[in-house]
Amino acid sequence: MKRYPLLIQLVLYFFLFILLLFGLIGSLYYQTSSGTIRQLTERTTRNSIDQSSQFITSYLKKLKQTTTVLSKDQAVRQFAQDKSADQETVQHLMRTMIETDPDLVSAVLVTKDGRLVATDSKISMQTSSDMMNESWYQEAIKERAMPVLTPARKESLTSEKEKWVVSITQEVVDQTGQNLGVVRLDIGYDSLQAYLDHLQLGKQGFSFIINQKHEFVYHPKKAVYSSSQEMQAMQPYIAVKDGYGKGGENFIYQVPIPDSDWTLIG
C-alpha cells in the first residue's frame, strides 16, 4: 500500500518535469521566432526603402533635367529678355512638356519684369507680383540657376478644384548669369504614390518623404500637409533614423535622397 503514493509522486514529478521542459522549449522557440521575425522585418524594410530611394533619385533626376532644359531654352530666354516678345512659342513649349510627361500637371514662367506665362488658365489669372513674393520664387533665385524642390502645397487648376503638388523651380539667366526670371514645374503624385503605396512594409507599414526643414513632401495621408496635429503625430517617426520607435513595436528606417534635401522614411 505504501508503494502507491511513491509511484504517484514519481508520476507527478515526471509530469511536472515534462510541463517545465515544454514551457522552456516553448519560451526558447518564441524568443527565437520573435528574434527571427524582427530581423526579417528590419531587413525587408531596409531593402524596400533603399530600393525606393533609387527609384526616387531617378524620378527626380528626370524632372530636374526637364526643368533645366526649359530654363535654358532659347525661346524662354528670348521671351524673358524681350518685353515685346509673343508668349505663344513659350506656352506651346511648356504645354508639349506637360502632354508628354504624365507626372507634370502645369508649368509656369515668371519673368523678372513681371510677365507671366502658364499652361493652366487658373494659374494665368494670378498676378506675377504675388508669385515673385512667394518662397518658391525667392528660393529659386537664391540657388543661382540650380533646380529647387518645394514641399507639398495645394494648387488650383482648371481641370480640378485643388490638387496637392510638389514643384521644381529654376532660375532663368542670360549668358552672363544675370537673372531673367523663374520657371516652375508642378508635379502630381500619381507615379510616386503608385510606387510608394505598394512597398512591402507589413500590414500597417507606410512610407513618407520630408525635406530638411521637416516639411512634408509626400505622405499617403494627405491630412498631414495641412494639420498641425497630424504633423505632430509623425514626429516620433522622424526622430528615429534606424531602429525601433517608442514601445518597440514599429521599426523605422530613413534614407536621404541623393542630390536633394528629401529624406524617405519607412
Identify what each model region corresponds to.
Residues 213, 221-266:
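Extracellular/periplasmic juxtamembrane segments that couple receptor/chemosensory ectodomains to their
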